């Protein structure tokens, strides 16, 4: 493996590292990043990792994630590490942790759940019932959702 950078360093922003291989697009989706926001986003998929074997990396220039955004990432990438970058240096580094409650970010996979009824203005709500690996339950129908279900 070459030691050269695949993607250049960012001056200020957030680097999301140790994303399980193939999950970077799901991370962008839960963060609501479509590419139309104007921020420069770099996405690297399936790079070698000592920790995971293979991993994805997302770099977001000029944006520091909020604590809510950081923790929502754990629903799709529980091994992710967040690096806050200022002046090309890592000023904070931490792991994601699953939130106790998720509201309005995901759809319940149960097609008969009240949250999926077109005329019912019910916000999907999920409660964390297990941290490792993350397991959530729908507050309305009781369906359990594992990693990857909430995308």
UniProtKB/Swiss-Prot annotation:
Alphabetized NCBIfam families for the sequence: ATCase_reg (TIGR00240)
Residues annotated for Zn(2+) binding in this entry: 108, 113, 138, 141
The record's free-text note on cofactor binding: Binds 1 zinc ion per subunit.
PANTHER family, per database record: ASPARTATE CARBAMOYLTRANSFERASE REGULATORY CHAIN
UniProt keywords, alphabetically: Metal-binding, Pyrimidine biosynthesis, Zinc
Cofactor list: Zn(2+)
Any one biological process term the GO annotation gives: pyrimidine nucleotide biosynthetic process
Family, per entry: Belongs to the PyrI family.
Species name: Pyrobaculum arsenaticum (strain DSM 13514 / JCM 11321 / PZ6)
A GO-annotated cellular component: aspartate carbamoyltransferase complex
Origin: domain of life: Archaea
Subunit record text: Contains catalytic and regulatory chains.
Protein name: Aspartate carbamoyltransferase regulatory chain
GO molecular function: metal ion binding
Gene3D superfamilies: Aspartate carbamoyltransferase regulatory subunit, C-terminal domain, Aspartate carbamoyltransferase regulatory subunit, N-terminal domain
Function summary: Involved in allosteric regulation of aspartate carbamoyltransferase.
């Amino acid at each position: 493996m070459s030691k050269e950078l695949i993607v250049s360093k960012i001056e200020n922003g957030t680097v999301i590292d140790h994303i399980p291989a193939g999950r970077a697009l799901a991370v962008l989706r839960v963060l609501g990043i479509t590419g139309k926001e104007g921020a420069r986003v770099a996405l690297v998929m399936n790079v070698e990792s000592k920790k995971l074997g293979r991993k994805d990396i997302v770099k977001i220039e000029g944006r520091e994630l909020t604590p809510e955004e950081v923790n929502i990432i754990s629903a799709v990438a529980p091994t992710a590490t967040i690096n806050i970058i200022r002046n090309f240096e890592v000023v904070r580094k931490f792991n994601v942790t699953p939130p106790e409650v998720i509201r309005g970010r995901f759809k319940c996979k149960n097609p008969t759940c009240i949250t999926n009824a077109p005329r019912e203005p019910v916000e999907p709500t999920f409660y964390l019932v297990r941290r490792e690996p993350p397991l959530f339950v729908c507050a309305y129908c009781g369906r359990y959702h594992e990693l990857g279900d909430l995308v």
